[in-house]
Amino acid sequence: MGFWKFSPFLVLGILALYQVGFLQAAPFRSALENPPDSGVRNEEELRLLLAAVMKDYMQMKTHELEQEQETEGSRVAVQKRSCNSATCVAHWLGGLLSRAGSVANTNLLPTSMGFKVYNRRRRELKA
């Protein structure tokens, strides 16, 4: 019911805005007076336009990155540095064996595996 009271004011407001916009429009020009050169721009205008576009693009990208960081901030898991050398792979496999052994209540970790095994073998070779 309130809509019928509001709609005449809405229509009058739209008409008033339309008339104001129409009256403020640029006056008509004759075809002989100063033909518009909309396709021709000087180099300075192009530089300013390019700078404005790049600035807006950078602001948009930084805003997107900030939003991604906010959403991923709660989901970020700690990642260890990966190592593909033979020593790292051997220690990784030893860790897997140790975990598998602890699940089965048996220790499957070989006696030659552990902390600084690689350095101990070097010392034995030098001696």
Swiss-Prot record:
GO biological process: adenylate cyclase-activating G protein-coupled receptor signaling pathway; regulation of cytosolic calcium ion concentration
Localisation per UniProt entry: Secreted
Domain of life of the source: Eukaryota
Species per Swiss-Prot/TrEMBL record: Canis lupus familiaris (Dog)
Lineage of the species this protein comes from: Eukaryota, Metazoa, Chordata, Craniata, Vertebrata
Record flagged with keyword Thylakoid: no
Gene name as annotated: CRSP1
Protein name: Calcitonin receptor-stimulating peptide 1
Residue stretch(es) of the prosequence: 26-79
Role description: Stimulates cAMP production in porcine kidney cell line LLC-PK1 via the calcitonin receptor (CT) but not via the CT-like (CL) receptor.
Span of the signal peptide: 1-25
Cellular component GO terms, alphabetical: extracellular space
InterPro entries found in the cross-reference section: Calcitonin-like (IPR021117), Calcitonin/adrenomedullin (IPR021116), Calcitonin_CS (IPR018360), Calcitonin_gene-rel_peptide (IPR015476), Calcitonin_peptide-like (IPR001693)
Family (UniProt): Belongs to the calcitonin family.
GO MF annotation list: calcitonin receptor binding; hormone activity
UniProt keyword annotations, A-Z: Cleavage on pair of basic residues, Disulfide bond, Receptor, Secreted, Signal
Cystine connections: 83-88
Keyword 4Fe-4S (UniProt): no
